[in-house]
Amino acid sequence: MPRRRVVGQRKILPDPKFHSELLAKFINVIMQDGKKSTAEKIIYKALDVVAEKKSEAHLSILEAALDNVRPSVEVKSRRVGGSTYQVPCEVRPVRRNALAMRWLVEAARKRGEKSMALRLAGEMLDASENKGTAVKKREDVHRMAEANKAFAHYRW
């Protein structure tokens, strides 16, 4: 592998309906087996359901949901001497978004509604109101980091 230069991150094309890069990224997180059009249908239907229930703009609710799910710290395993410590570390902005989207989708998949669009809509509504499984996941990660604050000096 050549060591000459660092390859920059690729620009993602905005989604066709709302022209949002964030939404395009979210579509890619939802997508399974390369079925992008199915993922787009799920997201757009979920956004319509959300806009119906709350009289706000589609993307503002998604933004609010992701803001409430984004973690600021996480723990990473670090082996020191013969024991492994859970060391709290700050999360980079790109990873924050990625984790928030992943947790939102995972929480939606575990819900009980009939279609994935309804599950996703429900989870987005819950997350925008600071409740739901995805927000609980973020709280757990923050609690874990708080509990292991004593090992923060092992940070790298």
Swiss-Prot record:
Which Pfam families has this protein been placed in? Answer: Ribosomal_S7
User: GO BP, one example?
Assistant: translation
Cited Gene3D superfamilies = Ribosomal protein S7 domain
GO molecular function annotations of the record: rRNA binding; structural constituent of ribosome; tRNA binding
Record's keyword annotation contains Transferase:
no
Identify the domain of life: Bacteria
Q: Which UniProt keywords apply?
A: Ribonucleoprotein, Ribosomal protein, RNA-binding, rRNA-binding, tRNA-binding
One cellular component term from this protein's GO annotations in UniProt: small ribosomal subunit
Q: Name the family the entry cites.
A: Belongs to the universal ribosomal protein uS7 family.
Under the subunit heading, UniProt states: Part of the 30S ribosomal subunit. Contacts proteins S9 and S11.
Function noted in UniProt: One of the primary rRNA binding proteins, it binds directly to 16S rRNA where it nucleates assembly of the head domain of the 30S subunit. Is located at the subunit interface close to the decoding center, probably blocks exit of the E-site tRNA.
Mind telling me what this protein is named? Small ribosomal subunit protein uS7
- Species whose genome carries this gene: Shewanella denitrificans (strain OS217 / ATCC BAA-1090 / DSM 15013)
